[in-house]
Structure formats: structure tokens, C-alpha cells
């Protein structure tokens, strides 16, 4: 195992034996071993020393000696002072620019919270987060982060959400944002404001990635980095010089999503990925690990998972003290001090630090005897030393073969003084008094006179000043300004005609039955054959290909694996063997719905991130979709994703035997909450084909910012085929699929998914046994019908003097008499959405599958949830009796209602 060049040990290392285990029974022998190791390092280098230590450890294991493992290193910087890369920038100019940005970020938040609307309340905002991050952002923007240009695809920046004021402050200096926009921070309704956090939906030409709610940024970024490798491996885009940078807080790492995929990043050698964890030791309420050390904890998590870990804890002002620490006493105190105390040090003063930190040992107290309290106070953490930050970033971007994580220690609220610096309430601090503002100005040398301070004016140097010239020169050298988002891809595609997919549009052969899942697979297979669009298809699986009958794709297009297939698959002699390939097209995520969704988001936003239109198809158990990764689905809407989500084995009664946790009766209700998610619950193969084709037209050909959710069934039955002229009605959400006789009385039966077939069966029962005619309407999208109705009602509300418009539901039903009964395999709320759009005076009954699912056969489940053909008949007759079309006694004769 090669040595990590960032962890070399100097020959004048401290005498660690002085603070070694007091149980050392032979200190002379220990010293001889230590001296021998030092000699090897000096004469043959750290790599040889590393090799010898590995051999010794292995030998000890072979002798059955229990060897405790620790993924931790000392509580010091990974990069020694004499090994750090020198920053090529103008340190003084960069410091002044950071000061201006700190001021403008603070002013933006404070100004916003001085507004006093009549309805009360504050706009909020955060000063402390950017205050701790300013030096980190400065290094990145000035020296590392490439914008998209002719020779570079652009780096991807996942910005810590609460630090957004600092990003706006930089963009203001760059001339990309106006003072008016800064004055309208968090005031967006008028169209001239800035969003609270990174939201591409709200600022589509600025923010690339949505990073709140917390935890989503780290997870999505890992799969983004992996997707860049995927694109490169498949020859779709050259991404080899691009990096994915992720900024997150140490408190944010408690979100399970934050660390949930770090193993994948190491397993796939994502050396294009850099995590920067802002370790200011604080979260909103208090310390992240008051009694412990969050940096050491995170180091072990990441190093144990196979990451390159770079710790930056101490600024340059500590270097001379550490160099004098020959006995390792200072290092031991650094390690023994817990995070709660470190926070207290920064919330107090130099005298407090002298007594409570250096005063823990007379030898360290002597070290600082000639230093004033101010000198001690100015011993800064590493994240506020721009030269050390540069060195850490430089090391990370030049590391090969592993993802890198930088654990950088900072102070939350740095520069805010007594009102916020290191205080528990700093996250909530958004109002500063006049004296606090004056101290802030003085600390950062902002050239604003006392006479103007009350207004907290923004500060922007003249364009011809050295600072402004430097600001623009650095971004020019890196290809342009960031963050910046592409709204459309430069490339364009024409979707093949609907006729191309006739295999799913035509009726099934006599005696042949298929499921809508099979219809989807047929459509996908045909699309993969298209020379233009086929290579852009990204099938995403979560260990369910065989469940959905998709294993035939394994050999056809292969499963992406950057290592290829280094084993002989057990089914190699079969036609559909499990084929992994460096250029494979399928993304197989394993049992990992959240990971699958992140891969889908990366592909679904590729038009923007990579200027390459990709077409992701992510299929999964519908119950484990929105319910499991709902926050990511919302983020996908925010990021204007385009692609297909396919909920398999959908419906509460369709999945035999699986029970409560598997049977989905509400995914469409959850999908309806996302404004740009277009959802369908088709019954027939031709509906699946029409909907998928329409989705391709909207998202690929027209580049509309929507994504589709389509539920699929595993129930086999004959398919009737597409009736010409119904395509548009299918897309709108409702069409007459089986007209009844001319008898009276009449009812209208609505349904979707598998329960539509129960409505068709009920139609026959009503006519044969009760003399009631029924039209059967397929409603592939109650959600789209509801949205159309709501839009219609809004138009009518805002245009009272004009003739009212009719909703699509109203248009379809107004010419067909009788009460209306809607039945679905989902909760009643699903079909209840259209109640107000049913023509006036008509009775509307809804049957649904409210309650927990359970295991049994389909017929028994449908009887249990009261959605089978017999209950539809009862509902129809009851509705007719309520309208006076039949006597109530007739309903009583057939009622199946249980006590």
C-alpha cells in the first residue's frame, strides 16, 4: 500500500514517547524502535517506512496478535507546514475582497430583517455560515473552480445552503446581481428578489443544484460525480477534467443521507469528487459533539470507507508553536480538548484561552509566556488561513484514485464579535445593532464613514481598482463566472413517430395476455434501438430487473461498472446473463432507492449540467418511491429535472401476498404535490405507449421542464389496442374507452389502473342484471384532470365578465347523462380531486383503497377494500336512487355493505 504523501512525518517529530502509555515496561526498547523508524524515514523515505509498518502488522496478525485498528491521525493538519503548496494569488487583495463580501452578505441579511410588514414577521437569513466559509469560497473561486468554457465542461458546485448570502455578495461585486436584487433578498414575489437558498426553479440561470433540505447535497453530489464518469466511459461527453465540489456542515453530516453513499464513491474511485466539510463545531442549537470531536469522528468514517482525508485544523500562526512542541505536549492537549471547550475558547478571549487551554500543562503555558492575550486570541483555525486553505484544495484536486474529503476547522460567525462569534445562537442571529455593525466594519476595514453606517450601505469598489480587476481576472482565467446554470441544451433531437412503437399500441393476439410493465419494457427496447436516442437512454434499476422482466437488457446493453467484469458470472451460459461492462448503459444501484433517485436526478438534469440530453428511466416498487425518497423528488422538481419515474407493482390490491409495506395506494397523491411532476396511472398497453411517447416529445424534443411518473402493473390481461383519435384525451387524462348501450337509466363509470377493469366488469353486470346502461371512462390521470380543473376555475375567477370555461372533465361528461362513479386502486382522495368539476346536479361517488394494505389474493383484497365490480354496482345503483332514477328498495336488494 503506497504511502499518502500528505501524511509524511518530519525527522524532527515530537518525542511521542513522552506522552506514551504509562504502562510501557521497557522504554529503552520503545525508544530503539522509534529511532529505527525515524532512521528509515530519513534515509529511505516515508514510502519505505509505510511498507515496513504494513509488513510488521501483517506478521503480527499471522501470529494471532489482536491488532486494534484506528482510522484516526493526530489532531493536527494533514499537510505539514514545509510541504504545503504555495498560493500563487495576491493574498492581500483576496483578503480585501473577502472583507467586502462579508460586509455585503451581512448587510443583505440585516437590511432584510429591518423591514416591518403590516402582517409582522421577519424574512430570516443567516450571517454566521458564510462568515465561517468565506476563506474556503475565496480559494475556490479565485484558483480552482472552472466555469463551463470551450475547453472545460465546468465544475459542479454544491453550495452549503445557509451560506447563500455570501454567494450573492460575490455575484454583486462581479456585476452579475444588482443592488436592487440584494435589497430584495428573500422577497421573490415581485420578480426582482433572491431566493433564500440555492433553488434552480427560482433562479434558473444562477443556481445549478438544490442543496436544501440538508443531507441531500452530499448524496446527490456523489451520484453526480459517478454520472460524469459514466458519461465519459460511454463516450457521450469528455468529463475527465471536471470536479464535483460539495460544501456541507459538520452538523449536516448527521443526516443519514450525508454519509449514506460514501462507500460507493470510494468503491468507484471517484477522484473527481471533493467534499469540503465546514467544521465550525456548531449546529443550530449547540455543539455538534460537545463531549467529543466531530472532526476525528468524520475522519474515521471517511478514511475507513476508503477516502483520501485531508484535515486542516490550525492556521499558520500555530506553526511555530507546533515546531517547538518536541515532547508532543501541545499535540496531546489539542487531542484531549473536546469540541465543547473549543467552542468556548472562541466565545471568550485570549486570557480565557491562555488559562483553560495552554494552562493545562506548565510546559505549554511556558510556550506562550511571551505572547500577549491578543496574540493568543489571534491563533486562528485553519479554515481562516487562505494560504493553508489553498494548499488543502491543491492537494485534493491533484489526488488520484480516491475521492477526497477536506475536514476544515472554522469558527461559526467569524468576525461577528460578541454578538455571534462562537455563540450557540449565532445561526439565528440576523439582526445587528449599530455598535455591532460599527465593530464589524472596523474589523474588516470597510471604507464606509460613520455618517452612513445607519443605512448599512452595500460596498462595491470602482471598476478600475486593483481589487475589481483582480476579481474579474481570476474568473476569466477559470473560464467565467459561477454559479451559472444552463437552461437548455445546445443539441436537439426529433422523437420518432408514435407508429414506431406499434408493438405496444396494437391489440394483443387472441389468447395472449401481458401486463403494462411488459408494455413498458417493449417500448424501452424499441427506443434503445433508435440510433439517435438509444444511446441517451439511462435505465436505472434498484435490484428489481427480474421483478419487472427487464433482465433481457443485461446482455443487450450491459450494466455499467468502471472495473468491468473481473469474474465469470454464474449464468454466463445463458442468453440473458448478468453482464457488467466498463461501457455498460444500465445503472444498477442495488437495494438503494435513494441512490437510484440520485442517479436519476443526475441524468435528468444532464441537459443543464453537461449540455447533453439524457433520458433516464428509473423503475422501482411504487411503494418505495415518493414515500421513501420524497425529499429528493421535490428537489428534482426544484432542479427542473426531465425524465421518467416508473412505479412498478402499483396499486393497493395488485401485488399478491406482499402486504402492508408493499401495497401502494397513495403514490399518485404524493406525486400530485410536485407541480412539475406529470403523473399517470394507465390500464392498457396503448396508454403506456402514448404517455411515454408524449413524455419524450415534451422533455426531449421541446425541452420542457417537467418529469413524468407512470405507475405500472404486474397483472396480465388482454390489451384492446389504441383507438384512433383518443391520443390527446389519454394525455389530458380521460377518454371514453367502452360505451354502453342506449338503455336508461344511465351511469358513467370512471376508473384507472387495474380497477378500470372492475368498472368494465361492473358495466356488464349493471346492464344484464339491473337494466342500467353504463359508459366506462378510462382516466389515466386524475392528477392532470384536477390540475386542468383548477386552472379552469382560476381563469373563470379572474375573468368574471367573460363566458366561463369548462374543465376537461366537464367537457367529457356534459353530453353523457347520469351519476358518476369513480373507482381506483388508490385512496379515495385521488379521485376526489375532480369532484368540483363534475357537471352540476350530478351525483359523484368515489371508491378507493383507504387504509393499510395486507396480504392475500387480488380478488379478496378488492373485496376487502370495496373496490371490486360488485361494490361499483352498489355505488352506481345508490347514486341512481339518490337522483330518483330507481327506487331505494332496488339498491337494498343488492347492497353488500358490511356491519
Language-model region placement:
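Thiamine diphosphate
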Residues: 4-5, 27, 188-210, 216, ...
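Non-catalytic terminal/interface segments that mediate subunit docking, oligomerization
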Residues: 84-105, 109, 116, 130, ...
Amino acid at each position: 500500500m503506497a504511502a499518502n504523501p500528505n501524511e509524511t512525518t518530519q525527522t524532527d517529530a515530537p518525542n511521542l514517547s513522552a506522552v506514551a502509555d504509562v504502562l510501557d515496561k521497557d522504554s529503552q526498547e520503545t525508544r530503539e524502535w522509534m529511532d529505527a523508524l525515524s532512521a528509515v524515514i530519513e534515509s529511505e523515505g516515508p514510502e519505505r517506512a509505510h511498507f515496513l509498518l504494513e509488513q510488521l502488522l501483517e506478521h503480527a496478525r499471522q501470529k494471532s496478535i489482536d491488532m486494534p485498528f484506528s482510522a484516526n491521525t493526530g489532531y493536527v493538519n494533514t499537510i505539514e507546514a514545509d510541504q504545503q503548496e504555495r498560493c500563487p494569488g495576491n493574498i492581500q487583495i483576496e483578503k480585501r475582497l473577502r472583507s467586502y463580501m462579508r460586509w455585503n452578505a451581512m448587510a443583505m441579511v440585516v437590511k432584510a430583517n429591518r423591514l416591518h410588514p403590516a402582517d409582522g414577521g421577519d424574512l430570516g437569513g443567516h450571517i454566521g455560515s458564510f462568515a465561517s466559509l468565506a476563506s474556503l469560497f475565496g480559494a475556490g473561486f479565485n484558483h480552482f473552480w472552472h466555469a463551463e468554457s470551450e475547453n472545460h465542461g465546468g465544475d459542479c458546485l454544491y453550495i452549503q445552503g445557509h451560506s447563500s448570502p455570501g454567494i450573492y455578495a460575490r455575484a454583486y461585486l462581479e456585476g452579475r446581481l444588482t443592488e436592487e436584487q440584494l435589497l430584495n433578498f428573500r422577497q421573490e414575489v415581485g420578480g426582482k428578489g433572491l431566493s433564500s437558498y440555492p433553488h434552480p426553479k427560482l433562479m434558473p440561470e444562477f443556481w445549478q443544484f438544490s442543496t436544501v433540505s440538508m443531507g441531500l447535497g452530499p448524496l446527490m453530489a456523489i451520484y453526480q460525480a459517478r454520472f460524469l464518469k459514466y458519461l465519459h466511459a460511454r463516450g457521450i461527453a469528455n468529463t475527465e477534467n471536471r470536479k464535483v465540489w460539495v460544501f456541507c456542515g459538520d452538523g449536516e453530516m448527521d443526516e443519514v443521507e450525508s454519509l449514506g453513499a460514501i462507500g460507493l464513491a470510494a468503491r468507484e474511485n471517484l477522484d473527481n469528487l471533493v467534499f469540503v466539510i465546514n467544521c465550525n463545531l456548531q449546529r443550530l442549537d449547540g455543539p455538534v459533539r460537545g463531549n467529543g470531536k466531530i472532526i476525528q469522528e468524520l475522519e474515521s468514517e471517511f478514511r475507513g470507507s476508503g477516502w483520501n482525508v485531508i484535515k486542516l485544523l490550525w492556521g499558520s500562526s500555530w506553526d511555530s508553536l507546533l515546531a517547538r512542541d518536541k515532547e508532543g505536549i501541545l499535540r496531546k492537549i489539542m487531542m484531549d480538548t473536546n469540541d465543547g471547550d473549543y467552542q468556548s475558547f472562541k466565545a471568550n478571549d485570549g486570557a480565557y484561552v491562555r488559562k483553560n487551554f495552554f494552562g493545562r500543562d506548565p510546559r505549554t503555558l511556558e510556550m506562550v509566556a511571551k505572547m500577549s492575550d491578543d496574540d493568543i486570541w489571534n491563533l486562528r483555525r485553519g479554515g481562516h488561513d487562505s494560504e493553508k486553505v489553498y494548499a488543502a484544495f491543491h492537494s485534493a484536486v491533484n489526488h488520484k484514485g480516491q475521492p477526497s474529503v477536506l475536514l476544515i476547522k472554522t469558527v461559526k460567525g467569524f468576525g461577528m464579535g460578541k454578538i455571534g462569534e462562537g455563540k450557540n445562537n449565532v445561526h439565528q442571529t440576523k439582526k445587528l445593532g449599530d455598535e455591532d455593525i460599527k465593530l464589524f466594519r472596523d474589523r474588516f476595514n470597510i471604507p464606509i464613514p460613520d455618517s452612513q453606517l445607519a443605512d448599512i450601505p452595500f460596498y462595491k469598489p470602482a471598476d478600475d481598482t486593483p481589487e475589481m480587476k483582480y476579481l474579474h481576472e481570476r474568473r476569466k482565467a477559470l473560464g467565467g463566472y459561477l454559479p451559472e446554470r444552463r437552461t437548455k441544451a445546445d443539441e436537439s433531437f426529433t422523437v420518432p413517430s408514435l407508429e414506431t412503437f406499434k408493438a405496444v399500441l396494437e391489440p394483443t393476439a387472441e389468447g395472449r395476455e401481458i401486463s403494462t410493465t411488459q408494455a413498458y419494457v417493449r417500448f424501452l427496447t424499441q427506443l434503445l434501438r433508435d440510433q439517435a436516442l438509444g444511446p441517451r437512454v439511462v435505465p436505472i434499476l434498484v435490484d428489481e430487473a427480474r421483478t419487472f422482466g427487464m433482465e433481457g437488457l443485461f446482455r443487450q446493453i450491459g450494466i455499467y461498472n468502471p472495473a468491468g467484469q473481473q469474474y465469470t458470472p454464474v449464468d454466463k451460459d445463458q442468453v440473458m446473463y448478468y453482464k457488467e461492462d466498463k461501457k455498460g448503459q444500465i445503472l444498477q444501484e442495488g437495494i438503494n432507492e435513494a441512490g437510484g433517485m440520485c442517479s436519476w436526478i443526475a441524468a435528468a438534469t444532464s441537459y443543464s449540467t453537461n449540455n447533453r440530453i439524457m433520458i433516464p428511466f428509473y423503475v422501482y416498487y411504487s411503494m418505495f418511491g415518493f414515500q421513501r425518497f420524497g425529499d429528493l423528488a421535490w428537489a428534482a422538481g426544484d432542479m427542473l429535472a426531465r425524465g421518467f419515474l416508473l412505479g412498478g407493482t402499483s396499486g393497493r390490491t395488485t401485488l399478491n401476498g406482499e402486504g402492508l409495506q408493499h401495497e401502494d395506494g397513495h403514490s399518485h397523491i404524493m406525486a400530485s404535490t410536485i407541480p412539475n411532476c406529470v403523473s399517470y396511472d394507465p390500464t392498457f398497453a396503448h396508454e403506456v405507449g402514448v404517455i411515454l411517447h408524449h413524455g419524450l416529445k415534451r422533455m426531449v424534443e421541446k425541452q420542457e421542464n417537467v418529469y413524468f411518473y407512470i405507475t405500472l402493473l404486474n397483472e396480465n390481461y388482454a390489451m384492446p389496442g389504441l383507438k384512433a383519435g383518443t391520443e390527446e384525451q389519454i394525455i389530458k387524462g380521460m377518454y371514453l374507452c367502452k360505451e354502453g348501450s342506449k338503455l336508461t337509466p344511465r351511469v358513467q363509470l370512471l376508473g384507472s389502473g387495474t380497477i378500470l377493469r372492475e368498472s368494465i366488469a361492473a358495466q356488464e353486470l349493471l346492464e344484464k342484471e339491473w337494466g342500467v346502461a353504463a359508459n366506462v371512462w378510462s382516466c389515466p390521470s386524475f392528477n392532470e384532470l384536477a390540475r386542468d380543473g383548477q386552472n379552469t376555475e382560476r381563469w373563470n375567477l379572474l375573468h368574471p365578465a367573460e363566458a366561463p370555461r369548462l374543465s376537461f372533465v366537464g367537457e367529457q361528461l356534459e353530453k353523457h347523462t347520469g351519476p358518476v362513479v369513480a373507482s381506483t386502486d388508490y385512496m379515495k382522495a385521488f379521485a376526489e380531486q375532480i369532484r368540483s368539476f363534475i357537471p352540476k346536479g350530478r351525483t359523484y361517488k368515489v371508491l378507493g383503497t383507504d387504509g393499510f394494505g395486507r396480504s392475500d389474493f387480488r380478488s379478496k383484497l378488492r373485496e376487502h377494500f370495496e373496490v371490486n365490480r360488485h361494490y361499483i354496482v352498489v355505488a352506481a345503483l345508490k347514486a341512481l336512487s339518490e337522483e330518483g332514477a330507481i327506487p331505494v328498495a332496488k339498491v337494498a336488494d343488492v347492497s353488500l355493505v358490511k356491519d
